[in-house]
Design a protein with these regions (language model features):
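Acyl-thioester-processing domains in fatty-acid/polyketide/NRPS systems
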Residues: 1-204
Length: 204
C-alpha cells in the first residue's frame, strides 16, 4: 500500500494478508517526497553511443548467476537484460522488448533492469564481488513519455557509491526515465532476515 501525507510525503509499505497469520504493523519499504519537477535538460540516450564507450561485453547469463550467488534471485519476468557492456565507471544494457506497459509509463521490471545494469560498475574499496547490494536511495526520479519497445539503459558512476541511470526508448532515446543520485548499500550478513513462511511476493 502507498500512504500519502499532506505536503507530498509518501510511504510504500506492506502488511500480512488477513487470515494468513496474526496481523502485524505495516512494514515500511521506502519513503520519499513527491513534487513538481523543475525544468531541467533531458539527457537523451543515443543508440550505440554507450556501447562504443563501454568496450567490454558482459554476459547477461553470468550477471544473473552472480546476482543469485549474492542472494538476489530474479525470476524470468525480471531477467530483462539481453546484452550488456561495461567501461570505465560506465555501463550500458539492452533490455528485452516489452509489448505492454500495463498502465504505466515505464514498467517497473524495465526500471529494475536498469538497476541490474548498475552492478556492472567497477566499485572501489573492499566491498567488491560477492557482496549483496540493495537499492538504498534516489535523489530525484523523472519520467518523460511512454517507454515502450526496445529499451537501452545507461549507468554512469558518480563517485564511489552514487550513479546516474537513464532508461530510454525510441531511436533518439527521448522517452523513458532518469534516476539521479541513485545509491546502493551492501547488505551486512547479520542484517539478512530468516526465510519467511508467507512471502509478501511471488518471484515472477
Amino acid at each position: 500500500e502507498c500512504a500519502l501525507a499532506v505536503g507530498g510525503g509518501f510511504e510504500v509499505r506492506s502488511r500480512q494478508a488477513e487470515g494468513q497469520e496474526e496481523l502485524e504493523e505495516p512494514e515500511a519499504h521506502c519513503s520519499g517526497q513527491a513534487a513538481a519537477a523543475e525544468a531541467v535538460a533531458w539527457r537523451a540516450v543515443e543508440a550505440g553511443s554507450a556501447q562504443r564507450r563501454c568496450a567490454t561485453a558482459a554476459d547477461a547469463g553470468a550477471l544473473y548467476s552472480a546476482s543469485a550467488a549474492a542472494g538476489l534471485a530474479y525470476g524470468p519476468a525480471f531477467r530483462t537484460v539481453e546484452a550488456a557492456w561495461a567501461g570505465d565507471g560506465e555501463a550500458a544494457a539492452r533490455l528485452r522488448r516489452r509489448a505492454a506497459l500495463q498502465g504505466t509509463q515505464v514498467h517497473p521490471a524495465d526500471l529494475d533492469g536498469a538497476l541490474q545494469a548498475s552492478s556492472l560498475l567497477a566499485r572501489g574499496g573492499g566491498e567488491g564481488g560477492g557482496a549483496t547490494r540493495l537499492p538504498f536511495a534516489v535523489n530525484a526520479a523523472r519520467l518523460r513519455g511512454r517507454a515502450a519497445g526496445a529499451l537501452l539503459a545507461e549507468v554512469e558512476g558518480r563517485g564511489a557509491e552514487a550513479a546516474e541511470l537513464r532508461l530510454a526508448a525510441g531511436a533518439w532515446g527521448e522517452r523513458g526515465a532518469q534516476l539521479e543520485g541513485f545509491r546502493s548499500r551492501v547488505l551486512a550478513s547479520d542484517a539478512a532476515v530468516p526465510p519467511q513462511k508467507q512471502h509478501l511476493y511471488v518471484t515472477a
